[in-house]
Structure formats: C-alpha cells, structure tokens
Design a protein with these regions (language model features):
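Active-site substrate-recognition segment that forms the wall
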Residues: 1-120
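C-terminal lid/capping helical subdomain adjacent to the catalytic/cofactor pocket in oxidative enzymes
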Residues: 115, 119-172
C-alpha cells in the first residue's frame, strides 16, 4: 500500500462478556501465561486467563491469540476454554450468564515492537502500527513520537527501535 510494505500480520483473539453482575472482580487479573503468550512468535493457538470487571458491571474474559490470517469465524471450543480458565480463577463466575462473545484482530509485528516513524522508502509516509493488543493504550505516546519527529523536536524517548527501516531487508 502506498509503495511501502511492513510485515504486519493479524493475531486473532476472542473475548467473552458476562451479564452485569455484582462486583466480583476489582482489578484486571492475568494468569502467569499471559506475558509469555503476548511475547510469543508461535502461530498456534495460545490462551491465558484475563478477567476484568467494567464500570457497567459486566466482566470481560479473555484472552486468546492465534496467527491464522483474517479468518473471522467463531471458534466455540476456544470460547469454552476461556470460560473454563476464568471459572477456575473465579469459581463465582460459574453462575454468571454470558451475554456475548466477540473476536478481533490485533496488528502484530514479528519482533513484537510497534512500527512508529517515517517510511524509509516513501517520503512523507508515517507509520504507527503493529501495537497488537496495546494500540489504544499506546496511541498517545505513539502520536507524541511522530509529532516530535515531524516537527524536528527531541522526544520523550528514543524511537530508533520502532523505526520502519528495521524491516527494509525483510521486505525486499
């Protein structure tokens, strides 16, 4: 697109949403596999327990990761696995009804770092991509890095490791 290529690929994931309920979960809870799964380059299915209460009283249950392209199908076995993992941590959730499940695609860079900066081959093209599941949370920092670079200002951190140029040899 626009004469540039980055090796950004989708990582599919599922989330379960419960009915509004009593406040059982006061903080986001991750199991010990979560960090390893986020950092993994394995294309196979990985699940780890993430349970988070919302202001509306619903509880979000995840997380799964799988590199299978843009396959948008629902996988009920994965949903069952996520529910089982969550209820093993929070047995009280066994009696809570699920409202829905949804899936999405996290943009993933093979080195697990976002791509932030000016394209080395297409002048004027700036990238902010590959943040995987942290894109919304990292958006302000990514925007600040790009703004500072465009304006020629020193930024709050060195963005060299996020440069799109790190993939030049990979994409040629």
């Amino acid at each position: 697109m626009a004469g540039s290529h980055l090796p950004i690929a989708p990582r599919k994931g599922f989330i379960l949403v419960t009915e509004p309920t009593k406040k059982y979960v006061f903080h986001k809870v991750y199991d010990s596999d979560y960090v390893a799964n986020v950092a993994s380059s394995d294309a196979d299915l990985q699940t780890s327990t993430v349970v988070e209460g919302t202001r509306a009283g619903t509880i979000l249950i995840g997380a799964s990761r799988e590199r299978i392209g843009f396959d948008g199908s629902m996988n009920y076995e994965i949903l069952r696995q996520l529910a089982a993992q969550a209820t093993s941590l929070f047995p009280v959730l066994r009696d809570v009804q699920l409202l829905r499940a949804y899936r999405g695609f996290r943009p993933y860079a093979p080195d697990h770092l976002p791509v932030i900066g000016e394209d080395s081959t297409v002048k004027g093209l700036w990238h902010s991509a590959g943040h995987e599941g942290a894109g919304i949370g990292l958006a302000p920092g990514s925007a600040a890095l790009i703004t500072d670079a465009i304006l020629g200002r020193q930024s709050f951190m060195d963005a060299t490791s996020f440069s799109p140029a790190r993939f030049e040899k990979v994409s040629q």
